[in-house]
A protein has these predicted regions:
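N-terminal alpha-helical scaffolding segments that mark the starts
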Residues: 1-20, 24-28
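Conserved strand-to-loop turn within each blade of WD40 beta-propeller repeats
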Residues: 28-31, 72-75, 115-119, 162-165, ...
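Canonical WD40 repeat/beta-propeller blade segments in eukaryotic WD-repeat proteins
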Residues: 10-18, 55-62, 98-106, 144-152, ...
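Terminal intrinsically disordered, low-complexity extensions flanking WD-repeat/beta-propeller proteins
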Residues: 176-200, 204, 240-241, 245-369
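Blade-loop segments of beta-propeller domains
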Residues: 45-62, 66
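Per-blade loop-tip surfaces of WD-repeat and WD-like beta-propellers in eukaryotic adaptors/scaffolds
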Residues: 1-4, 31-48, 77-101, 109-112, ...
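Internal alpha-helical scaffold/solenoid segments in large eukaryotic proteins
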Residues: 51-54, 132-157, 201-252, 361-365
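Structural hallmark of WD40 beta-propellers
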Residues: 22-26, 66-70, 79-80, 90, ...
C-alpha cells in the first residue's frame, strides 16, 4: 500500500532541493526567484527569497558539506549563494554561455559543479581562491544539441550527460590543482574534456541521468518511453533497454544498486528492479489506486514526522498495470525532479521527494521489508 503526503508550495515548481539537515527546502516557483522554506514547529514558513537572476531558474543544487546553493538560469548565468548571518549572498560564476543554462549539479566532493546548457556545452566550474571567484572550463564540440542533465560519478572525476541529440556521454573532468590522481577513478590518466564513452541507445531526446551508489551502473531515460541501464562503463559497456507503455520519464533515482524509481509525464513514480542476473524490468507504480497483491515486496508510506506538516491522502497500490486507471494521485501534473533524502550513515535510500508542474512537493518512504 502507498501512503502519500503532499504540500502545495506554489502553482508550479521548476525544481527543488533540500538543505543538508533537511529542515529547509528551496525551490523555484517557475520564475526567476528561489524560495526557501523552513520547518518551524511542524509548519513550513518562507524564510528567504533569492533574487538575482533575470529569467527562469531551470536548476538548483544545495551542497551538503559546505552549505552552498548553486543556481542556473535561462539568463545564461549561474550564481553560488553563501549564507552570511541571516542573508544569502550571491557570487556570479563566469560561464561564457550564449544560450540558457539548463541543469546544475555539485560534484561528489563539492569542490566543483557542472552546468549543462542549450549551447551544446557543459561548464565545469571551480573556485579560484587567489582571485576569489568561480571560473569554468568548457566541454565543447561533443554534444550536437542541448544538454538536459548532468550526473557526477562518486569518484568526483567522471561526469555523465544527456542531450536532446538522444545520446548519453561520459567525460573526464580532471582539473589540475583541483583534483588528484588518487581519486579512485577507473580512468586514471584521462584529461579534462576527454570523452570516455558515447551511448547511442536512444533515438529520441534523453533526460535524467544518474549513477548507482557504487558508480558501477548508469541509468537514464528517453522520450520514447524507455529507460536505459548501462554497466561496465568503458570501451565495451553492457547496456539494457526497458520499454514501458506509459508516458515518458524525466528523471531517475537509484534507491539501491538494484532498484530505481523514475518519474515523468505519467505523474506517478515507477519502480524498476534488477534480478539476480542483472536483468532490469518494470515492477510497479508507487501511487496506485488499486489494492496490491499480498506479498508485495515494495510499498510506500509517509513518516509520522513529515505527515504532521503535509496534508495526507492515502492511495492504494498495485503491481499490475491497468490502462484504464486514473493517472496521478499525489501529483496532478508532470513530475520533473526526484531527490534522495538520506539519513546519516545510510547508503540505501529509504526516503525521497518529488516535485512537479502542479506546484507540489511529495515525500515518499519505502517500506523496510
Amino acid at each position: 500500500m502507498a501512503v502519500v503526503a503532499t504540500h502545495q508550495f506554489a502553482q508550479c515548481i521548476t525544481c527543488h532541493v533540500w538543505s543538508p539537515d533537511q529542515t529547509m527546502v528551496a525551490f523555484c516557483p517557475n520564475n526567476n526567484e528561489v524560495h526557501i522554506y523552513k520547518l518551524i514547529q511542524d509548519k513550513w514558513e518562507r524564510a528567504h527569497v533569492l533574487q538575482k537572476h533575470d529569467q527562469l531558474i531551470s536548476a538548483i543544487d544545495w551542497s551538503s558539506r559546505t552549505n552552498k546553493i548553486v543556481t542556473a538560469s535561462h539568463d545564461r548565468n549561474s550564481y553560488v549563494w553563501n549564507q552570511e548571518g541571516a542573508e544569502w549572498l550571491p557570487t556570479l560564476v563566469i560561464l561564457r554561455l550564449n544560450r540558457a543554462a539548463l541543469c546544475v549539479k555539485w560534484s561528489s566532493a563539492e569542490n566543483k559543479f557542472a552546468v549543462g546548457s542549450g549551447a551544446k556545452t557543459v561548464c565545469v566550474c571551480y573556485y579560484e581562491k587567489d582571485n576569489d571567484w568561480w571560473v569554468s572550463k568548457l566541454i565543447r564540440k561533443k554534444h550536437s544539441s542541448s544538454v538536459t542533465s548532468v550526473a557526477w560519478h562518486p569518484d568526483n572525476i567522471l561526469l555523465a550527460t544527456t542531450s536532446t541529440d538522444g545520446k548519453c556521454r561520459i567525460f573526464s573532468t580532471f582539473i589540475k590543482g583541483v583534483d588528484t590522481r588518487d581519486s579512485g577513478t577507473s580512468i586514471p590518466d584521462s584529461k579534462f574534456g576527454e570523452q570516455i564513452v558515447q551511448l547511442d541507445l536512444s533515438s529520441t531526446w534523453a533526460f535524467g541521468v544518474k549513477w548507482s551508489p557504487s558508480g558501477n551502473t548508469l541509468a537514464y531515460t528517453g522520450q520514447s518511453s524507455m529507460v536505459y541501464f548501462v554497466d561496465d562503463i568503458g570501451p565495451s559497456p553492457v547496456a539494457q533497454s526497458v520499454a514501458f507503455r506509459d508516458l515518458p520519464l524525466r528523471d531517475v533515482l537509484f534507491i539501491s544498486e538494484r532498484m530505481v524509481v523514475a518519474v515523468g509525464y505519467d505523474c506517478n513514480p515507477m519502480v524498476f528492479t534488477a534480478d539476480e542476473r542483472g536483468i532490469w524490468s518494470f515492477v510497479r507504480f508507487l501511487d496506485e489506486r488499486k489494492l496490491a497483491p499480498s506479498g508485495s515486496k515494495y510499498g510506500s508510506q509517509f513518516t509520522e514526522a513529515f505527515g504532521k506538516f503535509y496534508g495526507q491522502s492515502k492511495q492504494m497500490g498495485s503491481d499490475t498495470v491497468d490502462p484504464t486507471r486514473a493517472r496521478g494521485g499525489a501529483h496532478e501534473n508532470c513530475i520533473t525532479c526526484i531527490l534522495p533524502l538520506r539519513s546519516e550513515g545510510v547508503t540505501v535510500v529509504k526516503r525521497f521527494s518529488t516535485s512537479g508542474l502542479d506546484g507540489r512537493i511529495v515525500v515518499w518512504e519505502l517500506d523496510s521489508d
